[in-house]
Amino acid sequence: MDGDILSLSGDIPGVFEARQNRSVRTRDGFINAGIGALQTRRLDDLKIVELAMVSGNSVGSFYTRFQDKDAYFRALSAYASQGISREFDSAFTADKLRQLGPSGGLDALVDLIGAIFGSKFRGVLRETYLRIMDEDDPWAPFRTTAKQTLQTLHEGLDDAFPHYGPDETKTRLSFCFQLIVGVIQNDLINKNHVFTLEDGSVLVGLKQTLRAYMGVPLTRQENV
């Protein structure tokens, strides 16, 4: 999750294409600064002068890369969605799920989603999620990745639960995914829960819940 800045599409509204190395470094510096700042603050609280200082750029250079702060946020969100999609594509495949089997496959999904929502993108995810009702729907790219991930889950574990029929297995796996995403998304904005992502307890709870729901025996350690 900590690779280089991805090449951003030139069709992001208000984001000016960076062609020269200096322009790319300026853009990347501002994006990295924003990713870090959003871990603890809201976008509306970020000052461009502060982002410039952290990134080692000038305020004027901000406007050579981004039309305004809304465009800047679109760039942050695009970078996060591309990075997260790439992570799912490499770490979560139908072949890997078949190798892991029912319990290992469910655990892998919980761990991967937990890792992504606890990564450097956490602040961008939170800000984007809080803007889900905006007219431009900034959450749409993440929703697309979720649909692709669910399809992979179905393909990889479609015959891993023989005690259920094919249709019920698909429905139950869909609910497993809904449960994981719903609980961990809620953790983005609400800390007042008995289990949290910060201490990892919510991941343990989710794994136990999914195994029980899918009729997979708990491990000896989980039964203790």
Language-model segment annotations:
Residues 1-25, 218-224:
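N-terminal intrinsically disordered/low-complexity leader segments
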Residues 12, 17, 36, 42-48, ...:
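Short glycine/proline-centered loop/turn elements that form peptide/ligand docking sites
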Residues 25-34, 51, 76-88:
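Generic hydrophobic, amphipathic alpha-helix propensity
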Residues 29, 37-71, 75:
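Helix-turn-helix
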Residues 38, 73-87, 142-145, 149:
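Alpha-helical DNA-contacting segments of helix-turn-helix folds
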Residues 71, 75, 89-120, 176:
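Hydrophobic alpha-helical connector segments
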Residues 103-105, 121-152:
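Short secondary-structure transition hinges
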Residues 139-143, 158-208, 220-224:
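Hydrophobic/aromatic-rich alpha-helical bundle segments in the mid-to-C-terminal region
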